[in-house]
């Protein structure tokens, strides 16, 4: 009998074990679709980004014009750019929903998978930040200036570090050149980390909505979840294409249609919407170093979630108190996102401070306390 190539070929069998014959829980919901959607986002961003890089010029005198030239003179350049810019938004929507799913269903107890995932989030944020600088509009320039300047808050080495990152005494041509190099490199780092993320995931297998072992009831990934994933791809790509075709600038800042000018500061410097929650936390502390530490902590706190898990149950499915806290946290992050887009004045300052405090309180104090209380109430 001939050997099955799919199961015996050195390379094909890796793909087979990851995407075809992979044993998957029979009851995973649509919340488990976001991993594959993130994969599609990554592929879309790399393909569109590569096509854009072919026409882009990383020079302060030419960057803005080269982007305009792309949109006017390159075949479908406008579409490629709009897909790339809005693809980043979809990437972040998917990753935030993916992390939310992980928090709700206790997926963070796969510690290695979770930790690599948090590193992936940091890599994605770095990629998006350096990418936003490349069109060299007003918000690109001032966003780069403000955010890189935060490193100067690091005691003793801060100022030196910032000037080293800038390649001079301000954000200028060397900064743009290196940001382009980093923006080209980082997605491939993300691809590598994604493979590590999947390798760790396939050691344990997927979690499921009940948070219980599902070894006794597995189904093959193909055809069941391949079909389910393709439905997800179709829905997400149709939303992305609709946004890119009907309202491509909806999520952008109008300030970025003005070429970068170091002599004119925009009235409200703010990052893209997906960083606003962290930006609000940064702004809510009236001290530079304190703000930077809070900004870092807002993401790095995710590393602590496996250590703060006090419940005897893995998932929140049967934990109503934790559910209430979880959705309060979601609402809180949305409030932070809104506050981050508002000017620094009353009442936004105090709202931002309260929301920042709530953010850390819920994650670090209330989640573990609620879980311990639920153990008692459920006599576990």
Swiss-Prot record:
Instruction: List ligand-binding residues for a ubiquinone.
Output: 202
Report membrane topology: Multi-pass membrane protein
Any idea which positions bind heme b b566? 98, 197
TM helices/strands, residue ranges: 34-54, 78-99, 114-134, 179-199, 227-247, 289-309, 321-341, 348-368
The biological process GO terms on file are:
mitochondrial electron transport, ubiquinol to cytochrome c
Localisation per UniProt entry? Mitochondrion inner membrane
InterPro entries in the cross-refs:
Cyt_b/b6_C, Cyt_b/b6_C_sf, Cyt_b/b6_N, Cytb/b6-like_sf, Cytochrome_b, Cytochrome_b_C_euk/bac, Cytochrome_b_N_euk/bac, Di-haem_cyt_TM
Looking up Pfam families in the UniProt record yields: Cytochrom_B_C (PF00032), Cytochrome_B (PF00033)
Needed cofactors, names only, are: heme b
Give the record's GO CC terms: mitochondrial inner membrane; respiratory chain complex III
* Keywords, sorted A to Z: Electron transport, Heme, Iron, Membrane, Metal-binding, Mitochondrion, Mitochondrion inner membrane, Respiratory chain, Transmembrane, Transmembrane helix, Transport, Ubiquinone
Cofactor comment text: Binds 2 heme b groups non-covalently.
Please list the residues that bind heme b b562.
84, 183
Taxonomy, superkingdom: Eukaryota
Q: Name one GO molecular function term.
A: ubiquinol-cytochrome-c reductase activity
Give the family this protein belongs to, as stated in its UniProt record: Belongs to the cytochrome b family.
Describe the task this protein carries out: Component of the ubiquinol-cytochrome c reductase complex (complex III or cytochrome b-c1 complex) that is part of the mitochondrial respiratory chain. The b-c1 complex mediates electron transfer from ubiquinol to cytochrome c. Contributes to the generation of a proton gradient across the mitochondrial membrane that is then used for ATP synthesis.
The record's misc note reads: Heme 1 (or BL or b562) is low-potential and absorbs at about 562 nm, and heme 2 (or BH or b566) is high-potential and absorbs at about 566 nm.
Q: How does it assemble?
A: The cytochrome bc1 complex contains 11 subunits: 3 respiratory subunits (MT-CYB, CYC1 and UQCRFS1), 2 core proteins (UQCRC1 and UQCRC2) and 6 low-molecular weight proteins (UQCRH/QCR6, UQCRB/QCR7, UQCRQ/QCR8, UQCR10/QCR9, UQCR11/QCR10 and a cleavage product of UQCRFS1). This cytochrome bc1 complex then forms a dimer.
* Protein known as: Cytochrome b
Q: State the species of origin.
A: Setophaga americana
This chain is encoded by the gene named MT-CYB
